[in-house]
């Protein structure tokens, strides 16, 4: 009887967990659909010539809940503006906004989040945070220059990092028309992040 009661108590928790995973899957699916739509739109895509003509959609890693992480967030006090190097040799103005610390497979990691001093002048980007990172899938399953993640300023002391929504910079597909921020040394992760957009090394870069 006690075993039966325990199972009944656990079932709602299991059902809730499954519902949350299903919601996460749908969110990632929408991210993938939106990204593909952007690259298939001639007015928005970074692709040119045959690369655009032949593009059918991005390859993606399978969704994995382990790569949606609730990290501890600490805002940087009195950050100073700095010039972040880009792929073209030019620089863009940023400031460090905070740090996210988390564990993955039992090991601790940290990533720095940045704020674009140009984008925050636009109302729709006032809460936007930029997370560039590299990991051990680069140059194998993902772009050698790393990947990006778009975030918003958290209201508390945690921030959700969903690597399932990470993507390659435009420069991975067209190095001639774009200058993309280079991932800072501090954001190079010594681990494989097998989530988000994969990369087919068929583009001019």
Description of each model-found segment:
Residues 73, 113-117, 135-137, 163-167, ...:
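A mature extracytoplasmic/lumenal domain signature
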Residues 50-55, 60, 77-96, 113, ...:
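Extracellular/lumen-exposed scaffold segments
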Residues 19-79:
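Start-of-domain marker
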Residues 80-145:
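Mid-length scaffold segments of soluble, non-membrane domains
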Residues 1-22:
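Bacterial Sec-dependent N-terminal signal peptides
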Residues 130-168:
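Acidic, glycine-rich flexible loop segments
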Residues 22-25, 167-205:
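Extended, aromatic/histidine-rich regions of cofactor-dependent oxidoreductases associated
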Residues 118-126, 151-159, 201:
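Short, surface-exposed linear segments at secondary-structure transitions and domain or protein termini
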């Amino acid at each position: 009887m006690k075993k039966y009661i325990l199972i009944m108590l656990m079932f709602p928790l299991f059902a809730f967990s499954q519902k949350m995973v299903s919601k996460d899957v749908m969110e990632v699916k929408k991210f993938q659909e939106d990204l593909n739509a952007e690259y298939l739109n001639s007015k928005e895509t970074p692709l040119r010539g045959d690369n655009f003509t032949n593009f059918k959609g991005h390859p993606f890693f399978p969704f994995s809940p382990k790569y949606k992480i609730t990290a501890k967030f600490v805002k940087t006090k009195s950050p100073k503006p700095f010039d972040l190097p880009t792929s073209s040799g030019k620089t863009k103005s940023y400031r460090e906004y905070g740090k996210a610390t988390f564990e993955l497979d039992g090991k601790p990691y940290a990533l720095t989040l940045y704020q674009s001093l140009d984008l925050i002048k636009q109302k729709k980007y006032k809460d936007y945070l930029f997370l560039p990172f590299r990991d051990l899938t680069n140059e194998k399953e993902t772009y050698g220059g790393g990947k990006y993640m778009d975030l918003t300023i958290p209201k508390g002391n945690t921030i959700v990092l969903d690597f399932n929504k990470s993507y390659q910079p435009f420069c991975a597909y067209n190095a001639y028309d774009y200058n993309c921020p280079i991932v800072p040394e501090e954001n190079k992760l010594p681990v494989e992040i097998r989530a988000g957009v994969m990369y087919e090394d068929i583009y001019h870069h």
